[in-house]
From Swiss-Prot:
EC number: 5.3.1.14
Enzyme class of the recorded protein, top EC level: isomerase
Gene Ontology cellular component annotations, sorted alphabetically: cytoplasm
Lineage start: Bacteria, Pseudomonadati, Pseudomonadota, Gammaproteobacteria, Enterobacterales
Name used for this protein in its record: L-rhamnose isomerase
Length: 419
């Protein structure tokens, strides 16, 4: 530990103590908040089922930065490099297309054995795993419908895929001793004016009920459902809208997933957290950065990321909110993208934990909005960076931009050699 860091740390402790904050307790609380990193940043959502296939479902990964992972070994190596540069507890979020098998496996036939290597790797790296059925980039999703498909056989294929995915998710939780959150997102929708908006939603409702009919121990598996405003090719109508899934999660008491990019650009999910928590048992958050649309840019330490973190901390939702990331930028170093986005989420959580929330709440309750605003703004100038640097030091990770040096070395020695 450098003397400079020690001095900054001691000064920070004093400054925060003056506003009633115990920084040691804040760091202990930060270690209760794992962030689930998404595997698909590492290979532009290609997966191992058909790596050369097209990405469909109304989503896009833009850019062609060299060095993307081409197989599971490379993807896990890239993840390990990123994990070394991110302090505190982490999880990994997998999609079904990241299965490993010597022979082709139909999506409705995936089994826990196809993810055994991921489980062993997670154990070695002390990670929990989360999961997602992959209801896109497949011939049977090419016409824009999956769980709401009008063809019963195709619809059943996707139902069976989701049911098989739940068994994989439960396997993760059982093996790793921490529940796997399995999120269902489907791209179903229409490009142009839709006459019958009800029938697809009726089919989706019935399909989801069949999907979740098998019961699993909640200590192993948690169901979540995710809405979206629109996607490319589904601009006019999305079957799984916010209202649909809010109603579904409330009536079935599943978790509800809120993705930062899946709403109108003037909406923010930070404002939805407290409302949804009154009705659903759990929330899954997909923290992302939409630029004009659901572009899935790398997460910044911006106002909305901070607001999301503050909502979690202010309302003590540690045990009811699951924090995941969802972005995929192929225009920059993919390992760096993971590190930047995940560190920013953790920084936002730390800043939220260093807020004198009780004092601010009292000011608000008494109607002293002047002092509330003044203290909120003064809080931004307190030396939270020194606390972050100590947190990094204690977790043996670089405190500042030094982590970029490690990424550059990895890029030169490993990534640059990939064709």
């Amino acid at each position: 530990m450098t003397t400079q860091l020690e001095q900054a740390w001691e000064l920070a402790k004093q400054r925060f103590a003056a506003v009633g904050i115990d920084v040691e307790e804040a760091l202990r609380q930060l270690d209760r908040l794992p962030v689930s990193m998404h595997c698909w940043q590492g290979d532009d959502v290609a997966g191992f089922e058909n790596p050369e296939g097209s990405l469909t479902g109304g989503i896009q990964s833009t850019g062609n930065y060299p060095g993307k992972a081409r197989n599971a070994t490379e993807l896990r190596a890239d993840l390990e490099q990123a994990l070394r540069l991110i302090p505190g507890p982490k999880r990994l979020n997998l999609h079904a297309i990241y299965l490993e098998s010597d022979t082709p496996v139909a999506r409705d036939q995936i089994k826990p054995e196809h993810f055994k290597n991921w489980v062993e790797w997670a154990k070695a790296n002390r990670l929990g795993l989360d999961f997602n059925p992959t209801c896109f980039s497949h011939p049977l999703s090419a016409d824009g419908f999956t769980l709401s498909h009008p063809d019963a056989k195709i619809r059943q294929f996707w139902i069976d895929h989701c049911k098989a995915s739940r068994r994989v998710s439960a396997y993760f939780g059982e093996q790793l001793g921490t529940p796997s959150v399995m999120n269902i997102w489907i791209p179903d929708g229409m490009k142009d004016i839709t006459v019958d908006r009800l029938a697809p939603r009726q089919r989706l409702l019935e399909a989801l009920d069949e999907v979740i009919s098998e019961k699993f121990d909640p200590a192993h598996h948690i169901d979540a459902v995710e809405s979206k405003l629109f996607g490319i090719g589904a601009e006019s109508y999305t079957v799984g809208s916010n209202e649909f899934y809010m109603g579904y999660a409330t009536s079935r008491q599943t978790a509800l997933c809120l993705d930062a990019g899946h709403f109108h650009p003037t909406e923010v999910i930070s404002d939805k957290i407290s409302a949804a928590m009154l009705y659903v048992p759990r929330l899954l958050l997909h923290v992302s950065r939409p630029v004009r649309w659901d572009s899935d840019h790398v997460v910044l330490l911006d106002d909305e990321t901070q607001a999301i973190a503050s909502e979690i901390v202010r309302h003590n939702l540690f045990d009811r909110v699951h924090i995941g990331l969802d972005f995929f930028d192929a225009s920059i170093n993919r390992v760096a993208a993971w590190v930047i986005g995940t560190r920013n989420m953790k920084k936002a959580l730390l800043r939220a934990l260093l807020e004198p929330t009780d004092q601010l709440r009292q000011l608000e309750a008494s109607g002293d909005y002047t002092a509330r605003l003044a203290l909120l703004e003064e809080q931004k100038s307190l030396p939270w960076q020194a606390v972050w640097e100590m947190y990094c030091q204690r977790h043996d990770t670089p405190a500042g931009s030094q982590w970029l040096d490690s990424v550059r070395v990895y890029e030169k020695e490993i990534l640059s050699k990939r064709s």
